């Protein structure tokens, strides 16, 4: 006889059982948290109290791919690496970075639903925006078991647009995402990169010029990979086009601008670029004690990078967005330095979110924002019994 669902710490229902399970949990007012493949459930604030986990691991697969319309519909538990592999067969891709800690080739990238629920954009946001801007439709199961839909299967459909944006970055606190329709992009046939090294006081103006220029890099990232922790942060630039001549012109333009500023510019072939981008995204999800989400106004990025608290730490920060990650072992980053970094980010018009921290540290994942009353009001509308991911929003 099967053990009742509500007695299980982790529930992995079949797709046909999912809605009924959520209804049962609602009737019991039982706390629970949605999950994809569970690879990053320990990110962010811990869920308050005992809480079951409802996994979408079996809710997996591509429902429909329309290459001519550049759209794909997939179930929320679909591994991101499998979705990208299928799109690549049609020379398309979902223009998002692998989540931090995915490892080489994205094998530990987690699920599509988890990617959207976290809503954390990487360097590719510079050209393609974040994942929330690529969602054109979704289906979710609300806390009472009701199915809800927003958007559609065509890019021009804007019905339910606000709901889609709400779900991106909701950390599983508003509902369980069951399927998603996203906009795909043609895979660029040509891609090369540039690695720029030099003093921050020279790199800062160059980054500002590049952001305001007519060039359109895929990424312009401040970065310091784990292998170069003794060095200052540099710039990692990715360029993509339909032909090699255009890339040569763009690389030449940037290199010519860099030379008088005593900035060295190293051209990167596709494999070299992919390797360096991979280094800036962490090797695996459990490879460090601290994982910090940094955010500042873009014009404050160089001041943040010069902060002694960040000295020697691997990091990546979008030059155009001011958003990024830093990570470290507990011995390399004392708690008081994280608190100092948080104050710096706030003074620079941003914030610091602690996604993961050592067991010996008890810092709040994030601080209260002025918008908290509005966020809590939205939460009550979606989850009146406060069952979903308690403490995560």
Predicted regions and their residues:
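N-terminal glycine-rich flavin-associated loop
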Residues: 10-34, 56-106, 120-153, 188-200
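Short beta-strand
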Residues: 33-34, 219-226, 315-319, 354
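Glycine-rich beta-strand-to-loop/alpha-helix junction loops that act as flexible
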Residues: 34-40
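Conserved glycine-rich FAD pyrophosphate-binding loop
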Residues: 46-49, 57, 102-107, 261-393
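C-terminal substrate-binding/cap subdomain adjacent to the FAD-binding core in PCMH-type
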Residues: 117, 136-285
């Amino acid at each position: 006889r099967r053990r009742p669902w509500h007695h299980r710490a982790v529930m992995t229902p079949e797709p046909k059982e999912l809605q009924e399970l959520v209804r049962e949990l609602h009737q019991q007012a039982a706390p629970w948290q949605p999950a994809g493949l569970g690879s990053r459930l320990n990110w962010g604030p811990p869920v308050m109290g005992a809480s079951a986990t409802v996994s979408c691991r079996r809710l997996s697969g591509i429902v429909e791919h329309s290459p001519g319309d550049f759209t794909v519909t997939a179930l929320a538990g679909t591994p991101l690496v499998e979705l990208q592999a299928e799109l690549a067969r049609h020379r398309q891709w979902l223009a998002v970075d692998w989540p931090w800690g995915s490892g080489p080739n994205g094998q530990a990238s987690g699920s599509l639903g988890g990617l959207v629920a976290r809503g954390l954009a990487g360097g590719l946001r510079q050209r393609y925006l974040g994942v929330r801007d690529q969602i054109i439709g979704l289906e979710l199961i609300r806390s009472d078991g009701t199915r809800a839909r927003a958007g559609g299967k065509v890019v021009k459909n804007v019905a339910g647009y606000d709901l889609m944006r709400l779900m991106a970055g909701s950390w599983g606190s508003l509902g369980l995402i069951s399927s998603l329709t996203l906009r795909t992009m043609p895979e660029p046939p040509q891609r090369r990169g540039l690695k720029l090294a030099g003093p921050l006081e020279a790199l800062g103006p160059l980054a500002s010029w590049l952001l305001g220029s007519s060039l359109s890099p895929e990424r312009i990232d401040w970065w310091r990979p784990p292998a170069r922790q003794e060095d200052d942060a540099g710039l990692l630039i990715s360029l993509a086009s339909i032909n090699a001549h255009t890339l040569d012109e763009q690389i030449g333009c940037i290199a010519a601008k860099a030379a008088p500023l005593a900035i060295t510019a190293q051209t990167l072939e596709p494999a070299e670029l992919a390797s360096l981008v991979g280094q800036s995204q962490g090797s695996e999800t459990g490879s460090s004690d601290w994982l910090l989400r940094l955010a500042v106004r873009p014009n404050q990025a160089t001041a943040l990078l010069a902060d002694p608290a960040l000295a020697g730490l691997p990091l990546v920060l979008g030059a155009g967005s001011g958003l990024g990650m830093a990570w470290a072992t507990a011995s390399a980053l004392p708690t008081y330095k994280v608190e100092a970094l948080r104050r710096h980010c706030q003074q620079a018009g941003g914030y610091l979110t602690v996604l993961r921290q050592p067991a010996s540290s008890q810092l709040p994942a994030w601080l209260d924002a002025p918008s908290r009353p509005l966020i809590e009001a939205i939460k009550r509308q979606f989850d009146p019994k406060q069952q979903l991911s308690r403490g995560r929003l």
